[in-house]
């Protein structure tokens, strides 16, 4: 796992940063990433599987290597999608500000857009060095399920320039997928076949 090859060759001007546990990645993730890319004319959307996020317990998640493999399997859905193992390769907690700083160095001259949900937007003031983060990226807040990010703007300099992007309402969550797999249900409408194959091969999400 390493940085995708675009970092050393072609330099996309507009790059979305799409982080998540991706346990597993599903069709909802694919849909909203494409919606944001369309809305903001992004050249790339970098999918960033979380390694050791400081605010989330990962004791019951699939092994990191398999989450990375599943994420790599979904990026073929759109030519704008790439994956980076930047957080997966980092020892210790992964802070978004450190990821953004590293990607800023890897993609000199590129404009970075951090894609988050409304819940994350509300909590942004609790993140590590949020002011520095906002100096490195432009925020993209996904409005979905009737939630409007602009109604919950935290008091931080830089948030006034956030992009609020309506995305499709997709009634799929990673929890739904895990439950369906454990119950022996057909999950082809929830996840790409390549992800399903990894889940079956590894016996994931079965109690």
Where are the regions that the model predicts?
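Nucleotidyltransferase catalytic core that binds NTPs
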Residues: 1-207
């Amino acid at each position: 796992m390493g940085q995708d090859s675009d970092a050393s060759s072609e330099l996309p001007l507009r790059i979305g940063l799409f982080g998540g546990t991706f346990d597993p990645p599903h069709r909802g993730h694919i849909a909203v990433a494409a919606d944001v890319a369309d809305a903001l004319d992004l050249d790339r959307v970098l999918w960033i599987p979380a390694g050791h996020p400081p605010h989330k317990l990962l004791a019951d998640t699939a092994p990191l290597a398999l989450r990375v493999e599943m994420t790599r399997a979904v990026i073929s859905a759109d030519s704008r999608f790439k994956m980076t193992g930047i957080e997966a390769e980092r020892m210790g907690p992964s802070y978004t500000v450190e990821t953004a700083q590293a990607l800023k160095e890897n993609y000199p001259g590129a404009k970075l857009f951090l894609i988050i949900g409304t819940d994350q937007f509300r909590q942004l003031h609790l993140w590590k060095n949020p002011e520095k983060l906002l100096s490195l990226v432009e925020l993209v807040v996904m409005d979905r399920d009737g939630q409007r990010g602009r109604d919950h703007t935290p008091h931080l300099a830089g948030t006034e320039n956030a992009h609020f992007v309506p995305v499709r309402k997709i009634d799929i969550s990673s929890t739904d997928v895990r439950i369906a797999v454990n119950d022996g249900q057909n999950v082809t409408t929830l996840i790409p076949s390549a992800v399903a194959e990894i889940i079956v091969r590894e016996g994931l999400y079965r109690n």
